[in-house]
Design a protein with these regions (language model features):
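Class II aminoacyl-tRNA synthetase catalytic cores and aaRS-like
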Residues: 1-599
Length: 599
């Protein structure tokens, strides 16, 4: 070995030890001929010292050393002189007096500083990702990711799950997003697809009698990117036979609580995880992935709004819309600039605007004077009306009420955006708090207004609620609930799952409602339908995203910070310069030809 100890492992109790270290040179300081270097490896950094009076040869070499050179040093661990300790370093009580140094490799001047906070554009960091990953925060992120995955594997293995790998090259059966297609050289004109998820394969494993399966699965979706999406991503894929919904949720909660308390014990974890229905989440939070760290819960005030002469409210309700909003406690003192910010936020989300009421007095709302009730222009109502509004919404003197008008589902989108904005404006959330919740009983179908058809709310293999199978022949398909569930945390969806259909006739009926012809169904889903006729057991599962979970645990706004080699939002790999054109000979072998896309 080229080293006997890790740089970040040295402590006061190591004083007097003779050590050999190896790593990268960080900060350099010269003081009166004495050279101080921070030597860094994956474990951390330690100060190494070169004194020309005791080790002239080593000091001469150190004079040439520059940042990010790779060196090996030998020396003795000493306690730092009193007053020179560095509490910002884990090794700040000690230093290594060097007697010998060997340059293992030199380095060009890096395009950005390799330190805690790199003041560099993200595109530059991605272009030199191998340098970016040397920075302590990136190393911490990847280390945490490793511990998360290891905990998952150990947890499930201890509970009799089998880790089974499913194919990467599969048949194209689009699940909502576009497939990545892979041409077959041996069968010209035919294509494989990269899996968007191992959905059918894990269900077939249940038919196979595996009973408890998991894998850390790579998934691929050709979709537009954003901060929490990548073209390729990693999820825990988990499936169980002979279970009901609560069995899956109980296991998932146990997994998450144990994992978080093990790998990030400093996080403030709310437990147990509440379970709320989709309808309740939309009613209370205007979102199916609510952040429950704070209140600001919704109230439908359409009935009271109908008593006003406010044209916006009345025209909205005449068109089948609602008036909903929430109370912002203690914020009646918002000034004109702050109110304009709220109105701009409403319009940016797609809403026409925002109605507000501020109760600035100290008396009960019903006793406030006209001058103490600040209302949006056009909304002029007497104190008695405000008393009833305040009673319904739970508002009081000193509070502000925000109201929005519109038709669903857009109204909830606007309200959710406003709720999030207000929480950020008032700093209502603790970044170290993790507030998980299960959202259950999603609709089985969503109406696609553009295509004039029903789509699966989750995916077509989701089972309807018990007792609602007969309603599949009716006209109120939007009222049918499913055995689908999501795990959400701090306003993000972390996992999605369901109890699956395991009966061919029911599965074919779902496909028919979704508009798939019998020929299409047989072509795309024939194997799993046939398998259902050979004793398929009741089964269900869940698929937590690894990238998003680790990003939340790390406090990162982007999953790119927890993936070793991510793509940009345009799907470009800046390090390897992918995608790129390929050699025409490769296209010829695949029987492919590039054609110009018509305007």
């Amino acid at each position: 070995m080229l080293r006997s100890a890790d740089c970040g492992s040295l402590r006061d109790e190591n004083a007097g030890d003779h050590v050999t270290l190896a790593g990268w040179v960080g900060r350099r300081r010269d003081h009166g001929g004495i050279i101080f270097l921070d030597l860094r490896d994956r474990s951390g950094a330690v100060q190494v010292v070169f004194n020309p009076e005791t080790d002239a040869d080593a000091t001469r070499v150190a004079e040439e050393v520059r940042g990010e050179w790779v060196v090996q040093v030998k020396g003795t661990v000493n306690r730092r002189p009193e007053g020179s300790e560095n509490p910002a370093m884990a090794t700040g009580d000690v230093e290594v007096m060097v007697t010998e140094i060997t340059v293992l490799n030199r380095s060009l001047t890096p395009p950005f500083y390799i330190e805690e906070d790199a003041e560099a554009d993200e595109s530059l960091r991605l272009r030199y990702r191998y340098l970016d990953l040397r920075r302590p925060p990136m190393l911490r992120n990847l280390t945490l990711r490793h511990h998360v995955v290891k905990y998952i594997r150990d947890f499930l293995s201890d509970r009799d799950f089998l880790e089974i790998e499913t194919p990467i090259l599969i048949k194209s059966t689009p699940e909502g997003a576009r497939d990545f297609l892979v041409p077959s050289r041996m069968q010209p004109g035919n294509f494989y697809a990269l899996p968007q998820s191992p959905q059918q394969m894990k269900q077939l494993l249940m038919v196979s009698g595996i009973e408890r399966y998991f894998q850390i699965a790579r998934c691929f979706r050709d979709e537009d990117l954003r901060a929490d999406r990548q073209l390729e991503f990693t999820q825990l894929d988990l499936e169980m036979s002979f279970v009901e919904e609560d069995d899956i949720l109980d296991l998932t909660e146990e997994l998450y609580i144990g994992m978080i308390e093990s790998v990030t014990p400093d996080k403030k974890l709310r437990k147990p995880f509440p379970r709320i229905t989709h309808a309740e989440a939309m009613e209370r939070y205007a979102s199916d992935k609510p952040d429950i760290r704070f209140g600001l819960e919704m109230t439908d005030v359409s009935e009271l709004a109908s008593e006003t002469e406010f044209r916006v409210f009345l025209s909205t309700m005449e068109g089948g819309g609602q008036i909903k909003g929430f109370v912002v406690p203690g914020q009646a003192g918002f000034v004109t600039g702050q109110m304009k910010d709220l109105d701009d936020t409403a319009k940016a989300s797609g809403a026409g605007g925002l109605a507000h009421i501020r109760y600035r007095g100290t008396n009960p709302v019903g006793q406030l004077s006209e001058n103490e009730i600040l209302q949006s222009a056009g909304l002029r109502m007497p104190a008695e009306w405000h008393r009833r509004l305040a009673d319904k919404m739970g508002a009081g003197p000193g509070d502000m009420i925000l109201l929005m008008a519109g038709r669903q589902p857009r109204l909830n989108v606007w309200l959710s955006a406003m709720r999030t904005h207000v929480s950020e404006l008032l700093e209502l959330t603790d970044p170290d708090e993790l507030a998980f919740a299960f959202v259950t009983k999603f609709p089985l179908f969503d109406w696609n207004e553009d295509a004039k058809r029903w789509d699966s709310s989750h995916h077509p293999f989701t089972s309807p609620e018990d007792g609602q199978e007969g309603e599949l022949d009716g006209e109120n398909l939007g009222d049918i609930k499913s055995k689908a569930y999501d795990l959400v945390c701090n306003g993000s969806e972390l996992a999605s799952g369901s109890i699956r259909i395991h009966n061919r006739q029911l599965q074919e009926k779902i496909f028919a409602i979704l508009g798939h012809s019998k020929e299409e169904v047989e072509s795309r889903f024939g194997p799993i339908l046939e398998a259902f006729e050979y004793g398929a057991p009741p089964h269900g599962g869940i698929a937590p995203g690894i990238d998003r979970l680790v990003a939340i645990l790390c406090g990162s706004p982007s999953i790119r910070d927890v993936i070793a080699f991510p793509k940009t939002q345009s799907g470009t790999d800046l390090l390897f310069e992918a995608p790129t054109p390929v050699d025409p000979k490769q296209l010829e072998e695949l029987s492919l030809r590039i054609t110009e896309k018509p305007d």
